[in-house]
Amino acid sequence: MDATNKQYALRDRAELSAFVNQPFRNNSRIKFTCFDCSPKYFVFGANSGSLYLYDRITTSFLAIFPSQLGTIGKVSISHNEKQIAIGNQTGSIGILSTELAPSTDGEGQPIDLGGPAFVTSFCWTEDDRELYCGDSRGIVSLIQFSLFMGRNILNISLHPVLLLENRIVQIDRYKDLLLVSTLSKCVLCNTAREEFKQIGNRPRDGHATTTTTTPSPPLMIVDEEDVRIFCSRPGSRLWEADLEGNVIRTHQFKQAAAAAAAQQQLQCLQESELATAPTEAPDGTLMVVPFQVLYSIRRQLLLVHDRCQLLIIDPLHSKIVLRTDEFTDITHVAVVDEWIYLLTGENRVFQVRVEIQGDEDPFPTPGMVDEPCLESRKQKQGVYILDSMLNNNNNNNGKQMNGKESPLLLSTEATIKEALVSVVRGKYGRNIKQMFMGYEQQQQQRTPSGAPERPKTLNLTKIYEPSRSNAFANGNGHALLAEFGIEAEVEDLECDDMMEELVQTRTGQALLGTAMPNGAGTGKQQPGKKKFSTSLLDGYETSEDDATVRNLYLIFRSSIISNLNFADRYAKIFDEYDTETIVRLLRKLETLMEENEEPNARLKCMRIYFHYLKPELLWEIDADSRQFIKDGFIVCNTTDGADRARLERLAHCAACGYYLEATASCHYREIGTSLLQYYWSRKEYDECFAMVKRVPYLWRTITRYYIQDRREDKVVQCVWNLADSELLERAAGELPFELDHWRQLFELAIAYHQRHEMICLSCDKPTGGRLEDNQPESQFRQWNYLLGVALAHIRSPTELLCLVRRYADNIPRGAIAPSFYIRCLLLEAK
């Protein structure tokens, strides 16, 4: 029966409170704080820290599991129903075994999340050997464990896999894909490739939840392209996305309050399609249900709720099929098959069943799917599905397939016309077109020996270029339909206007080709979708550089979304190439980032590489690569807003533009000093000072080279400008400083304090402008500190006293402590 003729109802409503509360009927202080259910069990967490286990079918009490974890905040039963994950409200996680006798240490080895955090969501993997848990800090962690002799859970380890900004609301999983929702966004994680993608671009303020729904067509043959992701949005809206994380459409479920009042009773309700725009009641009010956690019923319907309402949605047809407000104070909901279980206030538990009228088998079990038929269907891709239908029709009269009815012929008559429609209009149409175009391309590129030469890079424009001799290419296959008297649908024509891209960008550009609609002469680019991968083009070869750049960019995007450091993944790629090749890849990666409108693309590329680069390699690479690294080092220290603000606060020479002082630190210091050391050793001083002019921290390295080379004409000025105690003491001891050096230093100090003047370290011209006084520099420029260092390195204290007396008129009264004179007299007496 068509979905528009189905009717939905809530049946078998019952209250289970009397059975559930039986174990502690005489203790009113125990309250349920959470619960979960499976085909076999109910499990309730309580404020006492204990877990209560029940049989779901008979509602009989089975066992109590005491624990020392305190109030339980979250529970989750594994798929095999042998383990229960529990999390308390103070950040501890425990794993219980339902097959062990209850004991005080039933939770095995509790894990502490650390910090002020608590578990907000659990998600088991299919084999139940791993458990994902999300907490209130926005961290998703993977718990791996094993059972030892069925006695205790050992070797539990906690590995953070995703770091987000705020609380995790819900986690769901489909094969290798992990869906994580927070209060502001939804993230799709490919756990096999360690790739992360945010679903949609607009953040939300509230519970952003996700779930996957697998539609159930009449043949029960589901392709991955039919699996959908649904994310809740503010204002009773849902985002529908595919498994690549691309938002397909938005569902609006606002309804007028007056209209909602007519659907409050618990009975069979005819589904009604909602308008795209919200309707208003006569008083102008709108009924908005805040979608929090999404539950899937048989992976076909969606269940959402608030404190007093249940809504059941058919997401494929964008309809609310059931609504009831009979229950109040709903705190927790769980779903098993078509059964819905509710935990409300005062320890009340209800059950209700979803029924579809007009459907012979609304919820078939997975076991009813014929495995041979399913496997046979999976093996037929592209043109082979057409061949299968024709062969079955001719050889078996369209009725038998491996001794059973063919699932492809159960719902439709297999005619050539219908087969061609399904192939050309369906998802295989472009595959067929690419097969023919690929063959034509090979025929045109045959070598003199007669063997076809496959292109090294994929030229998308050439692949999709129409050919008069190719019916599939001419009109995207619609010419073939026209021969059979079949009209192409408008949506098919619109879909074919857009060409597939290898690496889709936000601006509609691709890495190896540009997606242009028909009539590309207009100059407008068609925005495309961002994907994890482009499986449609997997059959074609790309250049090694382009494939590597794509991988680097995917890793980069994953690191941005997950807030994790993928240095090991970058290193695995870079280890396969020499420096010259890596530089070439980074330049291409920068171009790709710019096409995707990534701000500061050069900065991000260099940070990726500098986390991998070993400074000692700078002595062995070619000049072009070294120049690239030098420029990247400057970019890393001058691009970020905080770095620019720090540089703007520094005084600089009005004549030559060099900074008069140095910053306290810099990024990638070892790389910068290694570059400076390389150029200095080869007397390439212009390269050195070009770096110093942009990154003034390197004045410290230059000063060390001055001390090493005994450049007495530069050392005193550098030491004073940099206000570095380590450099002053090193210079005073290694040169060593004589009386004349101290005289120069005192004159620089007097010029600074009286005229706010400093000497440029590059052009030796005096420049006005007082430096900002920070605590280390202020202490360095005090007379007591300078005289203390001088007294420790000068030969005769009497000479130092004479020098001080010479500049007595320029030294403020009280600037020199009496203890200095006492020390001079004591040293002279010795």
Swiss-Prot record:
Residues 578-604 form a coiled coil. Keywords: Coiled coil, Pigment, Repeat, Sensory transduction, Vision, WD repeat. It comes from Anopheles gambiae. WD repeats lie at residues 25-64, 67-106, 114-153. The gene is p. Belongs to the HPS5 family. This is BLOC-2 complex member HPS5 homolog. GO terms for biological process: developmental pigmentation; eye pigment biosynthetic process; protein targeting to lysosome; visual perception. GO terms for molecular function: pigment binding. Has a role in the biogenesis of eye pigment granules. Eye pigment granules are specialized forms of late endosomes or lysosomes. Biogenesis of pigment granules in the eye requires molecular components required for protein delivery to lysosomes. GO terms for cellular component: cytoplasm. It comes from the Eukaryota. The lineage of its organism: Eukaryota, Metazoa, Ecdysozoa, Arthropoda, Hexapoda. Gene3D superfamilies: YVTN repeat-like/Quinoprotein amine dehydrogenase. InterPro entries: Beta-prop_HPS5-like, HPS5, TPR_HPS5_insects, WD40/YVTN_repeat-like_dom_sf, WD40_repeat_dom_sf.
